[in-house]
Amino acid sequence: MKEKSKNAARTRREKENSEFYELAKLLPLPSAITSQLDKASIIRLTTSYLKMRVVFPEGLGEAWGHTSRTSPLDNVGRELGSHLLQTLDGFIFVVAPDGKIMYISETASVHLGLSQVELTGNSIYEYIHPADHDEMTAVLTAHQPYHSHFVQEYEIERSFFLRMKCVLAKRNAGLTCGGYKVIHCSGYLKIRQYSLDMSPFDGCYQNVGLVAVGHSLPPSAVTEIKLHSNMFMFRASLDMKLIFLDSRVAELTGYEPQDLIEKTLYHHVHGCDTFHLRCAHHLLLVKGQVTTKYYRFLAKQGGWVWVQSYATIVHNSRSSRPHCIVSVNYVLTDTEYKGLQLSLDQISASKPTFSYTSSSTPTISDNRKGAKSRLSSSKSKSRTSPYPQYSGFHTERSESDHDSQWGGSPLTDTASPQLLDPERPGSQHELSCAYRQFPDRSSLCYGFALDHSRLVEDRHFHTQACEGGRCEAGRYFLGAPPTGRDPWWGSRAALPLTKASPESREAYENSMPHITSIHRIHGRGHWDEDSVVSSPDPGSASESGDRYRTEQYQNSPHEPSKIETLIRATQQMIKEEENRLQLRKAPPDQLASINGAGKKHSLCFANYQQPPPTGEVCHSSALASTSPCDHIQQREGKMLSPHENDYDNSPTALSRISSPSSDRITKSSLILAKDYLHSDMSPHQTAGDHPAISPNCFGSHRQYFDKHAYTLTGYALEHLYDSETIRNYSLGCNGSHFDVTSHLRMQPDPAQGHKGTSVIITNGS
């Protein structure tokens, strides 16, 4: 009885072993491996292989009981697959949603030292770094699918880095940290969807598993990697600041190593790729090694080259702390988009098509180097622009204008306009504008010369608050605002500048006949280049212009520079002033014939679309006056306010203001200035007699001057009356504070007078 039970147990074990042996032979493994497997390993491997049938239903064809005809192509495919697996610098693995390794190729032993049998069927979490468990869980998790239920299967790409356990010898393991090796894994998560019979529009999905390929990153030592012609290496600090670069970088990117040292890698990477580079940098600091995505490294001559980098953190041999970053970079393409500048460090191969001034044709400033030396203090520093300069963009703004939300300086914009190309249609000239920002555009109402239809359309009339004259003065000094720029109210069109700038005075006057008569107040035939004096004070207009210099480009052969533009503007405004004084002496009929009967020039602020400003600098109102009225008179060395003289309603011509300190004012202009100071004009003139040739300044203008700044080009008010006297005078004008300061900060020189300087009347805040 005892013998029978022993024999029965032995027979049962033999049958069990034979069944396990037969089962092991069904596994797609070499017989040398299967013959050494124990029962637990056979069950583990068999279970894992059965799960693989879910991922790949075709399986192994005949080995899974399917009879099919084999062709020579199938045999070639199998052999090719085995060879590809051997030549692959990595290993293939399939992981179930629960983390069990369903399959891993035998090449894993080359990179990790762990056998295929040992890994298959076990949890991948047992072989990865504990800090990477959460990342692995996120990779294996499938979110709610967004695909239609008609799609049965789809794949979600995955790319991640894992620190896997490595048991290889130190000389063969490459770079390891704490017994773990960084493996770059890339593959896809396979999702299968099923539709429900009861509800055709509903369905469920199944997370089949992850199929990925694991690659070992190259070791850090450069001596262990053969650098080919399309590769270069660099060493950087932990913040990616370059310390050392290989000499091959010069022929691949155009930069010499010394050009890149002490700059971060982010400084030379395309802006759209900095996010991917930042993520790779973060992974590098956490895991010690990383392979970047393809990114664009900017070339020196413009454009970029596509690069992929293998970066490694090198630890200090003594302290075992991170020391630096060593990266091997593969340049994958030639330079693309050559000449496209994306960085200040890049040099364009060809100059931009849009330009300010010509580099081949000499300009006026090139022929007048003697006069230019007198303006040496206003020479500006060169500034290289990374982008082509288009005329539609106002790139030159004063950095001292912090109150403006656009960061633009009014005087800088006036002194340095950007000119349009006359070759293009509709761009014969561009206006030089000085911007002022107004909190409420309704404070400026329409003038007398505006058509009544527009007054009715916009429903704005002169109120007691606006007082009419303030609006008229605002329109004269500020002009019409540019269309399409809502935040700016009061864009003054100083003067239209043509593209061509003739060198001679006669040619320049012929090209701009509408403003040439201003120049004659300094004497007939006088061409002055010293009319603009720079300012050493910060925040001035000249400093705004000094900060940048017009760059030499090629497609504008006759454009003036910023200094020449301001000089000519000053000279032409002076000429126009004398012309107005001469026209005042003509009879009304002659004035009407000169200015054109029925012609009205009154630019104002409105909501409707306005046409571009015309060439006339003076936009006079329809209020007539045969002679200027003296608002400011001197009695026994004192200045009296308009309230004391009852001249509140008589206009004062702005053209009569002059500077007694100027050394170039002619005798006739001095007589006019004297006549202005001592004449007593009665306010008996009525509106409508004849158009006023010069804009008039009423007593109501003073309140407008208190709020806004105006530039009186060509005169120095601070030398006609001192600031304290003007301040006392303003106390008589409704108690408002009135101050006169020079924006250019030009103090009088006892040895030399001012030559066509510019001042600004500003509020005293």
Swiss-Prot record:
Q: What sequence ranges are listed for the domain PAS?
A: 77-147, 218-288
Q: Which residues does the annotated region (Disordered) include? A: 352-428, 527-560
Localization per Swiss-Prot or TrEMBL: Nucleus
Q: Name one GO molecular function term.
A: DNA binding
Q: Which residues form the bHLH domain?
A: 1-53
Q: Where is the composition biased (Low complexity)?
A: 352-365, 373-385
Query: What InterPro entries does the annotation carry?
Result: bHLH_dom (IPR011598), HLH_DNA-bd_sf (IPR036638), PAC (IPR001610), PAS (IPR000014), PAS-like_dom_sf (IPR035965), PAS_fold (IPR013767), PAS_fold_3 (IPR013655), SIM_C (IPR010578)
List, for all copies, the residue spans of the domain called PAC: 292-335
Q: Name one GO cellular component term.
A: nucleus
Span(s) of short sequence motif Nuclear localization signal: 368-387
Which keywords, in A-to-Z order, does the entry hold?
A: Developmental protein, Differentiation, DNA-binding, Neurogenesis, Nucleus, Repeat, Transcription, Transcription regulation
Tissue specificity of this protein: Detected in lung, skeletal muscle and kidney. During fetal development it is found in the CNS, developing kidney, mesodermal and endodermal tissues, including developing somites, mesonephric duct, and foregut.
Q: What processes in GO biological process is this protein linked to?
A: cell differentiation; nervous system development; regulation of DNA-templated transcription; ureteric bud development
Domain Single-minded C-terminal per the UniProt entry, residue ranges: 336-765
Stretches with biased composition (Basic and acidic residues): 394-404
Oligomeric and partner information: Efficient DNA binding requires dimerization with another bHLH protein. Heterodimer; forms a heterodimer with ARNT, ARNT2.
Name of the protein in question: Single-minded homolog 1
> What organism is recorded for this protein?
Mus musculus (Mouse)
Q: Which gene encodes it?
A: Sim1
